[in-house]
């Protein structure tokens, strides 16, 4: 009986070892593909907020980590720098609207360094379906209204919903959500105006992590 038990134990051990080996090989083979797909998806998102024709650098390779209250939280946010012939011309900045109706709204804001917004996309939110979710480009084109708009200083009153004297449509039954996004985009564009002199001092993405 002991011989039989040993045989079963050996079989199980061999099976476990072979399964582990197969899993390791599969992971090794699929990891590059998954990583490549993630990079492609990231590039597609970046292209939606910073048009590719504006720069000739590899925007994905120039990524920095920034922290600033203007970005909506104390957490680190990433910023991707776009350069034309070596000169920084625009950036895609991760930002947070902390005051959404159902919690924080994560954004990717593209802008030049003179206050012009190039594009905005929502990357994560928990807003109410049918109301606040109109910030998603797959549901509404509302988020594209930011394209090409200028932020003319911190006190630019146009950056508000129309019912508060601004130039942006609010949603029927939902004002908090668009207000939160508008304010976050405005703060992000203003922050990016201050960024160029700091670029050489920023920590690259992946450093000290």
From Swiss-Prot:
Cofactor annotation: FMN
Record-listed E.C. numbers: 7.-.-.-
Membrane-related topology note: Single-pass membrane protein
Localization of this protein: Cell inner membrane
Modification FMN phosphoryl threonine, positions: 175
GO cellular component, one term: plasma membrane
Main subcellular localisation: membrane
Gene Ontology MF, one: electron transfer activity
Keywords: Cell inner membrane, Cell membrane, Electron transport, Flavoprotein, FMN, Membrane, Phosphoprotein, Translocase, Transmembrane, Transmembrane helix, Transport
GO biological-process terms attached to the record: electron transport chain
Segments passing through the bilayer: 9-29
One Pfam family recorded for the sequence: FMN_bind
Source domain of life: Bacteria
Protein purpose: Part of a membrane-bound complex that couples electron transfer with translocation of ions across the membrane.
Assembly notes: The complex is composed of six subunits: RnfA, RnfB, RnfC, RnfD, RnfE and RnfG.
Similarity remark: Belongs to the RnfG family.
Name of the protein: Ion-translocating oxidoreductase complex subunit G
Lineage, highest ranks first: Bacteria, Pseudomonadati, Pseudomonadota, Gammaproteobacteria, Enterobacterales
């Amino acid at each position: 009986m002991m011989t039989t038990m040993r045989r079963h134990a050996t079989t199980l051990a061999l099976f476990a070892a072979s399964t582990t080996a197969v899993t390791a090989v599969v992971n090794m083979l699929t990891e590059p593909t998954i990583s490549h797909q993630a990079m492609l998806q990231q590039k597609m998102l970046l292209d939606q907020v910073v048009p590719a024709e504006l720069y000739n650098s590899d925007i994905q390779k120039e990524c920095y980590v920034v922290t600033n209250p203007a970005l909506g939280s104390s957490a680190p946010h990433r910023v991707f720098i776009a350069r034309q012939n070596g000169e920084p011309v625009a950036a895609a900045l991760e930002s947070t609207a902390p005051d959404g109706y159902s919690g924080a709204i994560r954004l990717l804001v593209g802008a030049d360094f003179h206050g012009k917004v190039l594009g905005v996309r929502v990357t994560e939110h928990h807003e109410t379906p049918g109301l606040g979710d109109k910030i998603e480009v797959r549901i509404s084109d509302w988020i594209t209204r930011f394209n090409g708009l200028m932020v003319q200083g911190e006190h630019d009153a146009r950056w508000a919903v129309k019912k508060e004297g601004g130039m942006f449509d609010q949603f029927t039954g939902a004002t908090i959500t668009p207000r939160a996004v508008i304010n976050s985009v405005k703060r992000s564009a203003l922050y990016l105006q201050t960024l160029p002199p700091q670029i050489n001092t920023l920590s690259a993405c992946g450093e000290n992590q």
